[in-house]
């Protein structure tokens, strides 16, 4: 079993926003990947962006630049 570690988890209101985040992050080489929303978090969309905690500032700036609105930003075991 893979050991869980604390990660940054960003949830979204819509699947479209989650997919836009994935596309932009891949284009920019930003850290992270799409995951199912962890059971400890409630969100409108079932997809979330998971990345290292250290990536938070860069990812938030990227979302502002591309008009992506997060539903929630969490630090949890994934």
Model-derived features: positions:
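Surface-exposed aromatic
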Residues: 42-47
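Short amphipathic alpha-helix segments
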Residues: 13-31
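Short Gly/Pro-enriched loop/turn and capping motifs at secondary-structure junctions
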Residues: 15-17, 39-40, 56
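Short, flexible, solvent-exposed loop/turn segments with mixed acidic/basic and small polar residues
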Residues: 1-2, 34-41
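Short glycine-/aliphatic-rich beta-strand segments at the starts of folded cytosolic domains
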Residues: 2-11
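Small/polar loops that bind or transfer phosphate-bearing groups
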Residues: 10-13, 51
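A short linear hydrophobic-aromatic micro-motif
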Residues: 31-37, 71-72
